[in-house]
């Protein structure tokens, strides 16, 4: 850090930052040399500015602005301006890695306290989702539904409920876990019956009556017992994801039906409830003219609309029965789950963005190992995302310490999976180095690249050996590597698909097929079919004489005779002249 601070370019930026309290990215890119911009020192530089209280901004926002040009002598201002203009004009063709580093450099580093805060936000979001699932009737209905499979050992208990140390469970602990599960499920089943009975009876009484209050107390008590039993069991992460996805799917279908009902209302100018009310008059053939006037369509279409409304209402009722709750409750669950997921997503995004520079610094250690640097960064980013998912702030480690292992593992695994799969022997590496050295010397002497013959002459090797060594020296490159000055294309866009037929060949094949059809059409039906089957003209699979004979219920010799006769007919000039142009050579 001290060596960095002693550099004149760094001192210049620090002076500018102290004068304004902030410094722009443009000034940093203009003043700092490339050896810092494209190295790990850039992280140290940003940390240095952060410690000095100098803010890095896109544009200067303060009135007391002192631009970088005021920190250099006046007679140097014109070249500096020219440099800035030239850099602006070439910004479209800048190295994508440099652009990426610049973008991630704009994200401020976060402290250990902020990491803990973000981890707690993730935990809070997970808690919202878990509480929603635990309080939903879908979970207990699902437990009861899976009970026979659990008893028959088709499903393991620890697949459904939360187990802190599943990997360390012995047979006795697993047995105790099953007993706890069955005990709580029995309580849930009993209280579910009490709850459903109370819910069905409470509807008969008004809210002010004594009976209503009795049943309300019974409902609250049963609900509390059920929730306590479920909370004692907990729910596995796998089951949380499964049920939350099911709830979101239900909410999506409910909203689709709601939108459909709104569309009906907009189209016919009548509320869905009012349209349904027309049905009792239609069944009695009463007020049909009035209904047609109100709806603006004939009575048959009104019947279809009512039928459509009832079908959709049946779908809603089926969902209510499946969930054991009302449509509104399902919507409320969905909103809570989405809120929790949003909280998790935002916190994870901030944690990932703040540590992208860590990925770059680790990826640099694995450069030149058979993978493009950008691919190393992307693989490292995948490892970073996994680290965010697995981070446990309560253990007291800094996130960067925890994430380094995941990032390194992702990069090393990618290198082993995607880099060279064939080991190059040591003697071949020596030969490759000889070719590279002679190529470099030739360029220094003559100012151009040598051809294979010239390298072979200098090394005293056969030309074929030079070609072979060059093939070994080839390094794999990414198909996603940007191509062109605008970086708007990828290398993969320019690789031809050899499996796709060219338009010219496709057109020629189509014309040839048509000519063959016309020629075959002049043969008798039996001969025509034999030729088609023998040469596979219909399905591309030629059949043997025996296979064709089996279909015609004749001997293979008879099929051979029919084929020979058909081919003699096809060789007649009146037929063969149509196909001669297609013979190669």
UniProtKB/Swiss-Prot annotation:
- The answer, when asked if Repeat is one of the entry's keywords, is no
Extract the ranges annotated as region (Sigma-70 factor domain-3). 430-506
Q: What GO molecular functions are on record for this protein? A: DNA binding; sigma factor activity
CDD domains noted in UniProt: Sigma70_r4
Q: Where is this region: Sigma-70 factor domain-2?
A: 351-421
Domain of life per record: Bacteria
- UniProt main location, coarse: cytoplasm
Pfam families tied to this protein: Sigma70_r1_1, Sigma70_r1_2, Sigma70_r2, Sigma70_r3, Sigma70_r4
Q: From the UniProt entry, list the residue stretches annotated as the region Sigma-70 factor domain-4.
A: 519-572
**Sorted alphabetically, which InterPro entries does this protein's record hold?**
RNA_pol_sigma-70_dom, RNA_pol_sigma70, RNA_pol_sigma70_r1_2, RNA_pol_sigma70_r2, RNA_pol_sigma70_r3, RNA_pol_sigma70_r4, RNA_pol_sigma_70_r1_1, RNA_pol_sigma_70_r1_1_sf
Q: Where is this motif: Interaction with polymerase core subunit RpoC?
A: 375-378
Q: Name one GO biological process term.
A: DNA-templated transcription initiation
Assigned GO CC terms? cytoplasm
Q: Which UniProt keywords apply?
A: Cytoplasm, DNA-binding, Sigma factor, Transcription, Transcription regulation
Residue ranges forming the DNA-binding region read 545-564
Subcellular locations according to the entry: Cytoplasm
Q: Does the keyword Transcription regulation apply?
A: yes
Q: Where is this region: Disordered?
A: 67-93
**What job does the chain carry out?**
Sigma factors are initiation factors that promote the attachment of RNA polymerase to specific initiation sites and are then released. This sigma factor is the primary sigma factor during exponential growth.
Subunit comment for this entry? Interacts transiently with the RNA polymerase catalytic core.
Q: What family does the Swiss-Prot or TrEMBL record give for this protein?
A: Belongs to the sigma-70 factor family. RpoD/SigA subfamily.
State the protein's name: RNA polymerase sigma factor RpoD
Question: What is the organism of origin for this protein?
Answer: Leptospira interrogans serogroup Icterohaemorrhagiae serovar Lai (strain 56601)
């Amino acid at each position: 850090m001290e060596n960095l601070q002693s550099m004149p370019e760094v001192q210049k930026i620090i002076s500018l930052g102290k004068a304004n309290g902030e410094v722009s990215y443009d000034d940093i890119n203009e003043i700092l040399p490339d050896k810092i911009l494209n190295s790990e020192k850039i992280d140290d530089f940003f940390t240095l500015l952060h410690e000095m209280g100098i803010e890095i901004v896109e544009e200067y926002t303060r009135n007391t602005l002192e631009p970088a040009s005021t920190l250099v002598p006046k007679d140097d201002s014109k070249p500096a301006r020219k440099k800035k203009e030239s850099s602006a004009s070439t910004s479209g063709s800048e190295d994508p890695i440099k652009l990426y580093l610049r973008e991630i450099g704009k994200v401020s580093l976060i402290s250990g306290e902020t990491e803990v805060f973000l981890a707690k936000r993730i935990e809070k979001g997970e808690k919202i989702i878990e509480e929603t699932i635990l309080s939903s009737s879908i979970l207990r209905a699902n437990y009861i539904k899976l009970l026979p499979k659990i008893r028959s050992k088709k499903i393991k208990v620890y697949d459904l409920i939360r187990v802190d140390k599943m990997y360390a469970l012995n047979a006795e602990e697993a047995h105790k876990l099953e007993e706890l599960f069955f005990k709580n499920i029995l309580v849930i089943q009993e209280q579910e019956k009490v709850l459903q009975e109370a819910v069905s009876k409470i509807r008969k009484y008004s809210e002010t009556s004594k009976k209503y209050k009795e049943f309300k107390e019974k409902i609250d008590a049963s609900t509390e017992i059920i929730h306590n039993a479920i909370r004692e069991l907990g729910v596995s992460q796998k089951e949380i994801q499964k049920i939350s996805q099911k709830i979101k799917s239900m909410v999506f279908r409910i909203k689709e039906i709601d939108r459909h009902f709104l569309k009906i209302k907009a189209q016919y100018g009548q509320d869905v409830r009012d349209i349904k009310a027309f049905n009792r008059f239609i069944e009695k053939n009463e007020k049909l003219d009035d209904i047609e006037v109100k709806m603006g369509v004939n009575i048959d279409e009104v019947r279809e609309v009512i039928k459509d409304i009832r079908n959709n209402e049946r779908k809603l009722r089926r969902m209510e029965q499946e969930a054991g709750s009302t449509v509104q409750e399902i919507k409320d669950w969905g909103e809570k789950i989405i809120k929790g997921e949003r909280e998790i997503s935002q916190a994870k995004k901030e944690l990932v963005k703040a540590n992208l520079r860590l990925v770059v610094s680790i990826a640099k250690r694995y450069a030149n190992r058979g993978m493009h640097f950008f691919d190393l960064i992307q693989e490292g980013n995948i490892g970073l995302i996994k680290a965010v998912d697995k981070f446990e702030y309560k253990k007291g480690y800094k996130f960067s310490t925890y994430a380094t292992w995941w990032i390194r593992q992702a990069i090393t695994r990618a290198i082993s999976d995607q880099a060279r799969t064939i080991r190059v022997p040591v003697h071949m590496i020596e030969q490759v180095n000889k070719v590279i050295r002679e190529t470099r010397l030739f360029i220094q002497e003559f100012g151009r690249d040598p051809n294979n013959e010239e390298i072979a002459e200098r090394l005293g090797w056969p030309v074929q050996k030079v070609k072979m060594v060059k093939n070994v020296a080839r390094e794999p490159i990414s198909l996603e590597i940007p191509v062109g000055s605008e970086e708007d294309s990828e290398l993969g866009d320019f690789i031809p698909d050899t499996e796709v037929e060219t338009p010219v060949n496709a057109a020629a094949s189509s014309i040839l097929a048509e000519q063959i059809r016309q020629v075959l059409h002049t043969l008798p039906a039996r001969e025509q079919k034999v030729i088609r089957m023998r040469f596979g003209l219909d399905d591309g699979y030629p059949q043997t004489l025996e296979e064709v004979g089996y279909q015609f219920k004749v001997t293979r010799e008879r099929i051979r005779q029919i084929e020979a006769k058909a081919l003699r007919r096809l060789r007649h000039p009146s037929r063969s002249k149509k196909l001669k142009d297609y013979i190669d050579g």
